[in-house]
A protein has these predicted regions:
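Non-catalytic interaction/regulatory modules that flank or connect domains
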Residues: 52-132
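Glycine-rich loops and low-complexity Gly/Arg-rich segments
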Residues: 12-15, 36-37, 119
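Short, positively charged interaction helices/loops
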Residues: 21-54
Length: 202
């Protein structure tokens, strides 16, 4: 267990899961995070930082602002997904001491919350404090084209990886547009345009 970087109880779960061909929650998370890492392998904007057997993956980006401050998007998943409940949290952590940039980021976070309250068929929670913005990730489900109705069937790890990666890419693009001077209407249009192409909401 020590050599694999995991606990003894988790190792037992992994062995049992292998025998009955069922994924443990830890294996499911590893598959999702490995998928995110693979999807971002060729990205010039987002750099994934993933350590196996953890409950989180970090994606690094930089802003076109004075001194090119770094933003780290941290995706942390819960152990075992339950239909109708949040599967985790996306946190954007801004490495900056610029008061002007922090105020801009706070405005962006509030703008995103307003946009999603108007466009998503479910509620998500937000928090903003000390240069850190967090948003809960809803239980992922496919929706019918032209409808926001979602089902309750859990998707496979590859589909969840894609949905999370696409969402982080959207938030990063909107944030960079905001830093570049985009107004609330422009951000709304960006979000809605992306939403129309999304098969999975979270």
């Amino acid at each position: 267990a020590h050599r694999m970087g995991t606990s003894r109880s988790n190792l037992v779960n992994m062995i049992l899961a292998e025998k009955v061909e069922v994924k443990t929650p830890e294996q499911q998370m590893n598959d999702i995070f490995s998928g995110i890492e693979e999807l971002l392998r060729t990205s010039r904007e987002l750099v994934p930082l993933f350590a196996p057997n953890t409950q989180r993956v970090t994606v690094r980006s930089s802003l076109e602002y004075k001194y090119h401050p770094t933003v780290r998007y941290e995706v942390e998943l819960v152990r075992g997904f339950v239909p109708g409940e949040s599967i985790g949290t996306l946190t954007a952590n801004f490495r900056t001491t610029s008061q002007g940039l922090l105020e801009l980021l706070t405005r962006f976070s509030r703008c995103l919350a307003r946009i999603e309250s108007r466009t998503l068929p479910f509620d998500v929670s937000y928090s903003i404090e000390n240069g850190k913005f967090s948003r809960s990730l809803a239980y992922p489900a496919k929706r019918s084209r032209g409808s926001n109705d979602t089902g309750g069937t859990l998707l496979d790890a590859g589909e969840i990886s894609r949905a999370i990666t696409d969402y982080v890419s959207l938030i990063d693009g909107m944030l960079k547009a905001c830093v570049g001077g985009a107004d609330a209407d422009t951000l709304y249009d960006m979000y809605v345009s992306d939403l129309e192409k999304r098969d999975i909401l979270l």
